[in-house]
């Protein structure tokens, strides 16, 4: 058992919750995991009181697949690295850097694996992908898919086919040959998988 007071979970937004916590005189050190802008704000507040701060910022968790990879193992690892939590985790591998010599074979197998996913009620044992947390996030995902298609990005699996009226459901969505400079590469917390190639 954890003794009382050792672990306290306080939820809220940065300006209403995080800032008062960092400013509190009983807080002697700060650890922050999140976006770069949030980290800058936390560091600024902590520095005003000369509190040490440790940060893990940004990134969007790229996964890298080399030409000598076991394709089946890599496909399963990549799929399980993003889709089960709907990409709604800071450790979701939402970017895939894949060697150009294996991208076609890899993508074909990844699409097959993703098509076997069961999107639905997370309380059902057969479900492998639950809903998006809220409407704003759900609509952002749909907008990103629409925008990417209009810009001509190669959509190889469209998760919008899983959309329904009784919740914020969307299936795995995969874009292939996406440049690292596009907004899809760092897109936050979604079912979107953006494939980039390297040589």
Task: List where the protein language model places each region.
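Glycine-enriched alpha-helix->loop->beta-strand junction motifs that scaffold or abut catalytic
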Residues: 25-27
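Acyltransferase donor/substrate-recognition loop-hinge adjacent to the catalytic core
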Residues: 183
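Single conserved hydrophobic/aromatic residue that forms the stacking wall/gate
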Residues: 191-194, 198-199
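PLP-dependent aminotransferase-like
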Residues: 1-18
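Beta-loop-alpha module in the N-terminal Rossmann-like domain of NAD(P)-dependent dehydrogenases
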Residues: 13-20, 34-41
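ALDH superfamily catalytic-core signature
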Residues: 29, 37-179, 187
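Short acidic alpha-helix that forms the nucleotide-activated donor recognition element
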Residues: 19-23, 186
């Amino acid at each position: 058992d954890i003794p009382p007071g050792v672990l306290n979970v306080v939820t809220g937004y940065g300006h209403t919750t995080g800032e008062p916590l960092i400013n509190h005189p009983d807080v002697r050190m700060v650890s922050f995991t999140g976006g770069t802008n949030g980290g800058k704000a936390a560091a600024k507040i902590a520095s005003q009181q000369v509190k040490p701060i440790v940060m893990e910022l940004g990134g969007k968790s790229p996964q890298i697949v080399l030409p000598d990879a076991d394709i089946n193992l890599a496909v399963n690892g990549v799929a399980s690295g993003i889709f089960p939590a709907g990409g709604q985790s800071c450790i979701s591998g939402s970017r895939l850097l894949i060697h150009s010599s294996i991208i076609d074979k890899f993508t074909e197998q990844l699409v097959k694996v993703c098509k076997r996913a069961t999107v639905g009620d997370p309380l059902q044992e057969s479900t492998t992908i639950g809903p998006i947390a809220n409407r704003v996030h759900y609509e952002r995902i749909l907008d990103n898919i629409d925008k990417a298609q209009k810009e001509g990005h190669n959509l190889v699996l469209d998760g919008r086919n899983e959309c329904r009226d009784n919740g914020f459901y969307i299936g795995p969505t995969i874009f292939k040959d996406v440049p690292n400079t596009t907004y899809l590469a760092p897109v936050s917390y979604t079912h979107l998988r953006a494939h980039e190639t390297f040589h």
